Amino acid sequence: MAKSSRATLALLIYGILMRYSQCTPIGMGFPNMRLDNDVFGDEGNSLSELSYEPDTMSARSRPALPEDAYTLYYPPERRAETHADGLLDRALRDILVQLSARKYLHSLTAVRVGEEEEDEEDSEPLSKRHSDGIFTDSYSRYRKQMAVKKYLAAVLGRRYRQRFRNKGRRLVVPSVWTGIRDTVIITPEKRGKRY
């Protein structure tokens, strides 16, 4: 661990020093070239007849860089093209992000509901699965109620069955004489009795 951190620190310091030595004029010194009007040949003799004019030297000097690098890489006649391309790229990127987000959310909801990863064509929509689940729950609840009723009918015998049969025939009739609502059961053996 200590060797790793030392090596990382040394690499970081080396990188910083190299960056500043190449980027600043103070760091790395360039070879000093003095071009005076006196030009010397191979033997060391003065060649004054070959003097360099400042006009010819300006061609060799470093070109002045524009302050904005954008103008260097994209000339004014191509800026409209690149701007339109950038807008199109940004719009396409936004659309792709939305599509991938929808697909990701769909996969999350499918996993929560209990569906395994399937193809888009084979999977049912979530609303259909939801309605199927509601129907299954309602049907299973109905089956349980019928099983309980059947059990009670078997245990309680005839009395429960008779009461269950008459449940649909009970009527709520207001009594004219008392002004109170009474329940009247209409069956062949109990005609007109009040409960």
UniProtKB/Swiss-Prot annotation:
Q: Which GO terms describe its biological process?
A: adenylate cyclase-activating G protein-coupled receptor signaling pathway; neuron projection development; neuropeptide signaling pathway; positive regulation of ERK1 and ERK2 cascade; regulation of protein localization
Localization, UniProt: Secreted
According to the UniProt entry, which residue ranges have a biased composition of type Acidic residues?
Answer: 115-124
A Pfam family hit: Hormone_2
Task: Give residues where Lysine amide occurs.
Answer: K167
Residues of the propeptide region, as annotated, are 21-82, 171-195
The record's similarity note reads: Belongs to the glucagon family.
Name-wise, this protein is Glucagon family neuropeptides
